[in-house]
Amino acid sequence: ASTTAAADGEEDNIIRVGVVCSMTGGSAIYGEGAQNAVDMAVEEINSGDSGYTVEIVNGGKVADDAKDAKQAMNAYNKVMADSPAAIVGSFFSSVTLPMATQAANDGMLLLATGATNVDVTQKGSTIFRNCFIDPYQGKMAALFVKSKGFSKVAVIYAKDDDYSNGLKDAFVENCETNGIEITYTGECMSTDTDFSSQAAQAVASGAEFLYYPCFLDTVPLFVGAARNAGFTGTIMGGDAWDGADTTGLEDKFDDCYFTNHYSSEDTAPAVQNFVQKYTEKYGTESLNACAALYYDAIYMLLQAAENGGGTDTASLVKGMTGMEFTGVGGKIKLDENGDAIKSIAFNTFVDGKVKWSETLDSDGNLVSSVE
């Protein structure tokens, strides 16, 4: 479709979308994935028979937030100047929070794509996300424990980190709800390097499962300490484990898992279809969860137009509210806050390399798993 309005009557069928992600700096690989995924979704929709055309403002380019709050506001203002009906982004909570505050003030629909901080959607009724929130991973870890039949678990968390606290609280609460005993709760700091004391106490408590919802840089140190203390059971973390360095600890990472937004190895047809098309066009380097979430976001806006009966912001907000959507990220139901209740991927490690293990739905039922 051309960028100028077509003949009378077609104007109503154009969904104008602004997109924001990190295009430069250390996180540029996310922006690359976002741009590719958005291009792919737009091309598919515009050559399809939905009757709608998606037009990406800013000349079709994803605006760069540079993973910086100030730069994010520049990116937001840049796409807003081009009159979008909705904005997609961003991937990091730190840059999405100020954009969400402004979007709520402007009455603009913002669909966040990776920002898991609880506060993002609290900014207003026009703010949604298609990723899970931090505490949700803790809940799903507890349901994993239940599905595997473990009855005694230990949790060690970084008390100085909001993310870690959020996952820990939800994990503990859902373990208690499901009759799973917490035999030991240990604290650490996000900068700690020695976990021998906590590991020894976890082992002494008789735990069969260790939950460590902390960031990737400390994960090898913690896993090493747990195994050295004689812990032979399952160890699990959240999406912040993604990219943890297992070098020299390959055997120690056996029977370790972490939750994530999606896995490119998931056997679900929607995932394999996306992975195949993306890889053919762009290769695998930028084929990450970010790409999958931005791809789904464009299709969610199409469904919002269909549900809401129009392509203006008010119609899209109406159509997005309470939406049920099936995409690369699985089955999604947007709750009263605009947060995604959705299936979650569990990855494990084989010879130190991340491998998909299984995907559970929001009730902890198995959706798909490795053969």
What is the meaning of each model-derived region?
Residues 1-16, 47-51, 363-371:
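Short, low-complexity disordered leader/linker segments with a strong preference
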Residues 11, 18-37, 61-69, 92, ...:
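Extracytoplasmic "Venus flytrap"
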Residues 14, 29-34, 47-119, 130, ...:
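Beta-alpha junction/loop-to-helix N-cap segments that form part of ligand/metal-binding clefts
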Residues 19, 79-91, 111-113, 154-157, ...:
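Periplasmic-binding protein-like
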Residues 23, 127-190, 209, 301:
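An alpha-beta-alpha
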Residues 72, 130-153, 165-167, 193-196, ...:
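Hydrophobic alpha-helical segments within soluble ligand-binding/sensing domains
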Residues 223-295, 360:
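Extracellular/periplasmic periplasmic-binding protein-like sensory domains
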Residues 280-292, 302-356:
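Segments of small-molecule ligand-sensing domains
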